[in-house]
């Protein structure tokens, strides 16, 4: 049996009179007084099928029994629709197929939610449980097809640039990379475990040691971490590494890759992309992931704050904190109620409160008006280039809290006041990150321990490691980090030094990274790399609310697969085979 001669989007007036066969799902079903209409849907489109009781009574009885989402194969003749009955919204809207034979290929149970009315809101957990039905609603499939085209464009471009796609192992060794590993017990080596890769980091660097020169891979990675809207326990990244190159060699390649990926959707990206250091981003936007679609840049107000008799300002200055904020053009229309909402909002991020100062035609209004002279406020307005009807929003807090609070407030106000267009795509390279950070009193890597320090800062490793900058870079799009990379350490002695600063003992270094240090000791070329988060890029490109909307079979925010009911308990015999005992 041949299931189809045409797809459901292909028939047109040029096919009138032809005998055809189409197959698909019953999208909609209508019985209009002895005439049954079926919208038959496949991945490509919809074709209207018609069966008239007075012409084919037995066939009509069979067709009248079908229900939504049954799978049919229909044979019939293409006819022009009656005048006035055309549907301009369908590629096949000028024709219909008069049914002559129908095969019911598969029946469907009662549906947990409507498929034909894809505008109806459906609970996300229900959608994930019945992901295969959710796909039929169209939007998920469209995004998966778009994702395929983006991946295809990526592969074609990387091949032209001389990169070789290499598939690296999924079963590897557990090495500290920041997040928890997913572990796989070994049956052959009792008590030993593989780790699923958080990234192909060490493998791709060893490929450079092996002389591959230019590598890429669309890799699946795994991280056992707390999830957010833009995080999943398994995710895809476009992984890239190249030898004998500097960031200035890499950036144009990645920028053109971005152009190729976005051109799939017909989006034009202007090159070169702007660059900004980590410190500049923190100073101007409070974050290393700035959204550049709108202004509201931060300004340091410490010099002005010294002229206030406001104890919160003076206390922060005495404790080494900061006072900074931004100007909202036309923001003097914010009510006290709205400002109270913003005050409670910034408290979520550790701020004690929000200072607001309105520049009005008849003077100023502020919750700190009595703590400074008119001249001080005028100087502040001038510093912010504030005009009448603008408002200054300030926070006094330790630097990290002020930055985090203002970053979130800035994003919120930008969205609420429609300061940007959702179809804008503003990229920026963020460079020169700190090499180290301090967490819970311990030094840790800002990115990962294989990142090279800037040459001019290497001398500070012994005296002031927290001030050392790294040769690292992130690519940020509309406030999302979509790529991250760095120049790698290619010297075994320097790599050992970094490990020792991270308080890894010689025994621990040998146990976890001995193979890697050994590889670096056999003549390693200077090399660098980057990884682009494919899921996150697709999320931004499609306007999806989260990366679950661009992944075929995603997990929930609790890392559960509701469709397969995973994770799940396994049989006692399997545990015994793996020499594992579950204690709780």
UniProtKB/Swiss-Prot annotation:
Annotated HAMAP family = Asp_tRNA_synth_type1 (MF_00044)
- Protein name per Swiss-Prot or TrEMBL: Aspartate--tRNA(Asp/Asn) ligase
The entry's keywords = Aminoacyl-tRNA synthetase, ATP-binding, Cytoplasm, Ligase, Nucleotide-binding, Protein biosynthesis
- Identify the coding gene: aspS
Q: Which family does it belong to?
A: Belongs to the class-II aminoacyl-tRNA synthetase family. Type 1 subfamily.
Tell me what organism the protein belongs to. Chlamydia caviae (strain ATCC VR-813 / DSM 19441 / 03DC25 / GPIC)
Q: What's a GO cellular component annotated to this UniProt protein?
A: cytoplasm
- Do you know which Gene3D superfamilies this protein is assigned to? Bira Bifunctional Protein, Domain 2, GAD-like domain, Nucleic acid-binding proteins
What is an annotated GO biological process for this record, any one?
aspartyl-tRNA aminoacylation
Q: GO terms for molecular function, please? A: aspartate-tRNA ligase activity; aspartate-tRNA(Asn) ligase activity; ATP binding; nucleic acid binding
Localisation: Cytoplasm
């Amino acid at each position: 049996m041949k299931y189809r001669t045409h797809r459901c989007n292909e028939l047109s007036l040029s096919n009138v009179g032809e005998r055809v066969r189409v197959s698909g799902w019953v999208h909609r079903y209508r019985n209009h007084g002895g005439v049954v209409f079926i919208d038959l849907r496949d991945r490509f489109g919809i074709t209207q099928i018609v069966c008239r009781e007075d012409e084919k009574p037995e066939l009509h009885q069979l067709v009248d029994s079908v229900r939504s989402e049954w799978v049919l194969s229909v044979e019939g003749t293409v006819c022009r629709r009656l005048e006035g009955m055309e549907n301009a919204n369908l590629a096949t809207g000028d024709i219909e197929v008069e049914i002559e034979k129908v095969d019911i290929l598969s029946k469907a149970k009662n549906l947990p939610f409507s498929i034909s009315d894809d505008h109806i809101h459906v609970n996300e957990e229900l959608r994930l449980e019945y992901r295969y039905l959710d796909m039929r609603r169209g939007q998920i499939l469209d995004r998966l097809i778009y994702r395929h085209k983006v991946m295809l464009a990526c592969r074609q471009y990387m091949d032209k640039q001389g990169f070789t796609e290499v598939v690296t192992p999924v079963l590897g060794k557990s090495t500290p990379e920041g997040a928890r590993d997913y572990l796989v017990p070994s049956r052959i080596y009792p008590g030993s475990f593989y780790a699923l890769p958080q990234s192909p980091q060490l493998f791709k660097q060893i490929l450079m040691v092996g002389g591959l020169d230019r590598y890429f891979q669309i890799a699946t990675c795994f991280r056992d971490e707390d999830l957010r809207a833009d995080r999943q326990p398994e995710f895809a990244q476009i992984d890239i590494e190249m030898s004998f190159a500097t960031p200035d060699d890499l950036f144009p390649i990645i920028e053109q890759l971005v152009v190729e990926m976005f051109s799939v959707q017909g989006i034009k990206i202007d090159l070169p992309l702007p660059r900004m250091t980590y410190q500049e981003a923190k100073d101007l936007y409070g974050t290393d992931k700035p959204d550049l679609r709108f202004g509201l840049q931060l300004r340091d107000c410490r010099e002005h704050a010294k002229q206030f008799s406001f104890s919160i300002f003076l206390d922060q200055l005495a404790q080494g904190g900061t006072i900074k904020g931004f100007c909202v053009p036309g923001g003097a229309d914010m009510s006290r109620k709205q400002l109270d909402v913003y005050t409670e909002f910034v408290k979520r991020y550790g701020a004690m409160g929000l200072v607001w100062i309105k520049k009005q035609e008849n003077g100023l209004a502020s919750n700190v008006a009595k703590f400074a002279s008119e001249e001080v406020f005028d100087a502040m307005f001038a510093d912010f280039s504030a005009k009448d009807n603008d408002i200054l929003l300030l926070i006094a807090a330790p630097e990290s809290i002020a930055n985090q609070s203002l970053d979130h407030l800035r994003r919120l106000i930008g969205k609420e006041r429609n300061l940007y267009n959702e179809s804008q795509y503003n990229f920026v390279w963020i460079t020169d990150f700190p090499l180290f950070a301090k967490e819970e009193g311990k030094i840790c890597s800002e990115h990962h321990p294989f990142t090279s320090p800037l040459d001019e800062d290497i001398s500070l490793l012994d005296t002031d490691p927290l001030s050392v900058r790294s040769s690292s870079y992130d690519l940020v799009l509309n406030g999302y980090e979509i790529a991250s990379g760095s120049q790698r350490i290619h010297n075994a002695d320097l790599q050992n030094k970094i490990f020792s600063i991270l308080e890894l003992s010689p025994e621990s270094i040998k146990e976890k990274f001995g193979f890697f240090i050994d590889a670096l000791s056999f003549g390693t070329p200077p090399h660098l790399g980057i990884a682009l988060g494919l899921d996150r890029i697709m999320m931004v490109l499609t306007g999806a609310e989260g990366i679950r909307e661009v992944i075929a079979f995603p997990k929930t925010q609790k890392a559960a697969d509701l469709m397969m009911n995973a994770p799940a308990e396994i049989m006692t015999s399997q545990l015994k085979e793996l020499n594992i005992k579950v204690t709780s």
